Regions:
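Small-residue-rich segments of transmembrane alpha-helices in multi-pass membrane proteins
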Residues: 25-37, 57-63, 83-95, 114-124, ...
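Helical membrane-embedded segments and adjacent short helical loop/helix-boundary regions
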Residues: 1-68, 79-80, 84, 88
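Transmembrane alpha-helix/helix-exit interface in multi-pass inner-membrane proteins
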Residues: 93-110
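Entry/N-cap segments of selected transmembrane alpha helices
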Residues: 73-97, 138-147, 197-203
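C-terminal ends of transmembrane helices
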Residues: 5-17, 63-76, 152-160, 179-186
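Alpha-helical membrane segments and immediately flanking helix-loop junctions
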Residues: 107-144, 158, 162-200
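Juxtamembrane boundary at the C-terminal end of a transmembrane helix
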Residues: 101, 207-216
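Short helix-capping/hinge motifs at transmembrane helix termini and TM-loop junctions
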Residues: 17, 38-39, 104-105, 131, ...
Length: 216
């Protein structure tokens, strides 16, 4: 069901070429409607999707290969890539926690949304370490990725960001794999740098969380 709906969503996105019809967003919407209309229990759906869920771990390991592939560009642009990922990851976590506190959503929601800009397996590991709620984390990760994929190209044009490395790093840091799919549409270098940024920002997020929790 998930694969079939996603394939349809990808076809629809390519057919319409609309950023609002993001494949992930369309897939989630269709599946939610389908589960509700046909009264399918969420537990049953989750059991059926176990195989897909089990691929999250190997998918994360592939990030190391993307770093290896782009090692020359990473070496020549190490400082701006590292600083960009560090600043982006820090701002993402601080803003998420700050907004949750501002609107009185509580520590549980705040801790669950901290890793929203990292890829799903890393985000789930971080939220598990913090004692957050996995379902909230996944919702935050998905929303962040979709919003990044939709608005990143617009923001790059708005602020006249022409450097392809900068575009890729910004997209990968703030909107992980969902944004990287959009970055690949923009160009090969943007997509590659976005993939590198996912891995680097994911590692930095883990280190920042470990450092913060040890201090607290």
């Amino acid at each position: 069901l998930s694969i079939g709906v996603f394939a349809f969503a990808v076809w629809l996105n390519r057919k319409t070429n609309s950023p609002l019809l993001n494949p992930l967003l369309v897939t989630v919407a269709i599946i939610m409607i389908g589960l509700t209309v046909f009264n399918i229990p969420l537990d049953s759906y989750e059991k059926g999707a176990t195989l897909i869920s089990s691929m999250l771990g190997p998918a994360t390991a592939v990030l190391a290969f993307s770093i290896y592939q782009q090692r020359k560009i990473l070496q020549s642009n190490f400082l701006p890539i590292f600083v960009g990922c560090l600043v982006g990851s820090t701002v993402s976590m601080v803003s998420a926690y700050g907004l949750c506190e501002l609107f009185g959503l509580g520590d549980q929601v705040a801790l669950s949304t901290l890793p929203k800009s990292t890829t799903a397996p890393i985000a789930l590991a971080v939220t598990g370490e913090l004692g957050g709620t996995a379902s909230i984390t996944m919702a935050a990760v998905m929303t962040t990725g979709v919003m990044g994929a939709i608005f990143s190209p617009m923001l790059a044009n708005l602020f006249h960001i022409k450097n392809k490395v900068a575009q890729g790093v910004a997209i990968g840091t703030c909107s992980h794999a969902v944004g990287t799919a959009k970055a690949l549409e923009m160009g090969k270098l943007e997509g590659a740098m976005s993939g590198v940024a996912i891995a680097v920002s994911g590692l930095l997020t883990c280190f920042i969380v470990i450092a913060a929790t040890s201090i607290m």
